[in-house]
Every structure is written in C-alpha cells, then in structure tokens.
Amino acid sequence: MDLKSHDTADFRLVYRDAGPVSLLLDKAGVKPWFDGEHTVLKQGGKVEARLLRTPSGTVFVKHYLAKGVLRRLLAWVGVFRAQRMFRVSAALQDIGVRVPRPLAFLVEHRRDCSSSFFVCEALDAEDLKSVAVNRGLDAIGGAFRLFDEVSNTLVRLHGAGYVHGDTKWANWMVTRGEPQLVLIDLD
C-alpha cells in the first residue's frame, strides 16, 4: 500500500490520496476540516461518525476521543484506534473481505485529550437490516445467497485471525445497483 504522511506540531496524518484530506495538507487545521460541510451519523462521548464533504467527494470519518485513563495511556505510547482501524481495514481487503476502502488516519495531539480520526470511502448503500425489513431478502438474491456470502466472509475473516465482535444485520451494508455485502463497524 502506497502511503504518504504529513506531520505538524498538532497532528500526524497518514493517507493514500490527498483529495479527502487536502484541507489538512493546506494547513487548515483539524477543526476546520472536521467541521466542514457534513452530516452527523453518530455522536457520543467517545466516538463521533460523520459523512464529510471534501473537494474529492464525500467520505466517512470516525473521530475517536481518548478520554478515559486507559485510552489516554495507550495514546501516550502511540496506540490509536483510528490507526488500528486503517490497518485492519487494509488487511481485510487484502484477504478478500469487502470493507469500505481505508483512505487516511489522523492522530491529533492536544493537552486536554488526544484523539484520532479514521477516514474511509463513503458507501452508496443501506444496512442489511433495513433491506430485509423494507424490501425483503429476495431483493438482494435471496436468503441462501445472503447466508452463503456472510458465512464465506466470516470464514475468511476468522481464518486470517480476525474477529468482528459486533456482527449483526446493521453492520452489513448492501451496496446499491448490483448488491454486494460490505462489512462495517470493524472496531
């Protein structure tokens, strides 16, 4: 994987392609980039997920706050959730597991709280639970095809030493057009 990095006094950025993070490379700072035009998908005390519109299109960004003692200690020694997500996503793609393409991760260093950001492709998809409830499984090839694909994916995942930890219908996305299953929420 061809990666580039960009370091400032405030953050370290590792990326594949400059488009989604061009504002950071242009010295806009983390806050203006993350607070750009966006849609909040999930907001909590430790994690926030957004669809962020960038000059190269919409991307999915998950912001991890290292607030607790353990997370702060791990951040202090250089272990960040976004970096782990980036590496796991790339490794899973390498073994044929469909996951959103990882684009970048950013590690921000602040006195009050270290945080990290995972950036990946935004999917044109809906979650499997919604598909099953609203349109039925026949709309995506039927139950047999679905369970065959899910089981084969989980075999590849487990065969490579990975466990999802939260495998549920809502963590499988079904792409629009030619329906394909994509596994999400890998953390």
Residue spans of the language-model regions?
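AlphaC helix of the protein kinase catalytic domain
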Residues: 128-138
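Catalytic activation segment of kinase domains across protein kinase-like and atypical kinase folds
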Residues: 170-187
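Conserved short alpha-helix within the protein kinase catalytic core
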Residues: 140, 144-151
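Active-site flanking residues adjacent to catalytic metal/cofactor-binding acidic residues
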Residues: 61, 165, 184-186
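A short beta-strand motif that forms part of the nucleic acid-binding face
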Residues: 65, 135, 187
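Juxta-kinase regulatory segment immediately upstream of eukaryotic protein kinase catalytic domains
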Residues: 1-39
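Conserved ATP-binding subdomain of kinase catalytic cores across diverse folds
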Residues: 26-128, 149, 155, 159-160
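Catalytic-loop of the protein kinase fold
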Residues: 159-169
